[in-house]
């Protein structure tokens, strides 16, 4: 990295807005389409299962391209790569919006996923490298807010657009944001390019990465639909992923110019930070996916209202993050993360105790609001720990690798959560159904009560079956909340293996 004077004043503010908007745009796009899949599939004359490839295609392409960011940044420069990625993302978004067939949409979602990969790691790296060292914690805090708020806004915005406008606007909204990001970046970072190196292309590493991570991501996305290892396709994808990733690790550790710099894991703080942020994000993101589905399927919420019930989690971080960033240099990051994990556990236990049939909007919204304290003390401190002790020229590679592990953990968390939810519901459904028989006086009393309300026996059976399904879904969700709370308490000990001092992005030690 060329040693340049950090930005100041208005230039610093404009750059912060530009990089935060780019992060917001990319994270938003990974969740905004989820609730609109039925609308998109119906409009393009496809089945719902075919429509899910709109999500899968983006996730696979994005998972492959994120780890490449460090190598690409060394090759072409961080500023240039960031600008071209933003421009390409805006163009691909427009192309997604005008797609007239599902195949066309999936093709442009792949392009969108590929060019989106560098946006988050580079926004993080450029932010840290152009901020005054004393203010880097504030920069990370502001950046973290966008990562927190965007996944919450996605389902709300996606639901509102698909309910009221053409689904194409889900993608069109990226175009003006992309243009604004490019203009602001040119104004502030032109002439501040990072040093480049003419490195040969690690073709073997690239091929293994594409095959291994691509197979793994498709397996995670398609597993639940295909009933996991009952499907030959899932078994083949798993074998291919395991073999390719094992070869990738061996190859990258022995190659002179690796496309993924695994030597970063020699840093104790990088390894501990990646582990903590990935495992915690796995639980956090799994709940982000589970909660709206539970509210829609059991409690009859619309997509928009389910999103609004999840939204309060973003309120506290918006208020607290700048304050935490301001005083971060006086705080032990491990204490903040410990507080965060305790609050996560408290909120998951809270849900497990209070989620029941007939609960109101507040029963869902209040735990989300309080969980905001956990989220505010999560991303920024763990990112600071992860990047501490690394020289500026390794920040892009470190940021891309840590964001890759976090993104992959989110996919794994989603798959595990939704699969457990479905499987446990089936088990509870079978157990609850056993009690509905002619020999159970409570069951017969319920039938009599329903028939007294004018239902036929068939209608009463259907109503009871639906209630059993709802009970099973609630019980299985509560079991997941119990398990998540327990794992957060176990994670408390892991963060204390990190070694201070924790300077944000290059400042401070960090054990090697």
Curated annotation (Swiss-Prot):
Top-level taxon in the UniProt lineage: Bacteria
Extracellular-side segments: 39-51, 101-109, 160-164, 224-233, 296-305, 356-363, 429-481
Residue numbers on the Cytoplasmic membrane side: 1-12, 73-81, 129-136, 190-202, 250-271, 330-335, 388-407, 505-512
An MF annotation (GO) of this entry: transmembrane transporter activity
Family matches, as InterPro entries: EmrB-like (IPR004638), MFS (IPR011701), MFS_dom (IPR020846), MFS_trans_sf (IPR036259)
Record bears the keyword Transport: yes
Coiled coil region boundaries: none
Annotated Gene Ontology cellular component terms: efflux pump complex; periplasmic side of plasma membrane; plasma membrane
Pfam families on file: MFS_1 (PF07690)
One annotated GO biological process: response to antibiotic
SUPFAM superfamilies documented for this protein: MFS general substrate transporter
Cell compartment(s), UniProt: Cell inner membrane
Membrane topology: Multi-pass membrane protein
UniProt keyword annotation of Glycoprotein present: no
Listed transmembrane segments: 13-38, 52-72, 82-100, 110-128, 137-159, 165-189, 203-223, 234-249, 272-295, 306-329, 336-355, 364-387, 408-428, 482-504
Keyword terms of this UniProt record: Antibiotic resistance, Cell inner membrane, Cell membrane, Membrane, Transmembrane, Transmembrane helix, Transport
CDD domains on file: MFS_LmrB_MDR_like
Subunit-level organization: Part of the tripartite efflux system EmrAB-TolC, which is composed of an inner membrane transporter, EmrB, a periplasmic membrane fusion protein, EmrA, and an outer membrane component, TolC. The complex forms a large protein conduit and can translocate molecules across both the inner and outer membranes. Interacts with EmrA. EmrAB complex forms a dimer in vitro.
Family statement: Belongs to the major facilitator superfamily. EmrB family.
Reported function: Part of the tripartite efflux system EmrAB-TolC, which confers resistance to antibiotics such as CCCP, FCCP, 2,4-dinitrophenol and nalidixic acid.
Protein name per the record: Multidrug export protein EmrB
Organism of provenance: Escherichia coli (strain K12)
This protein's encoding gene: emrB
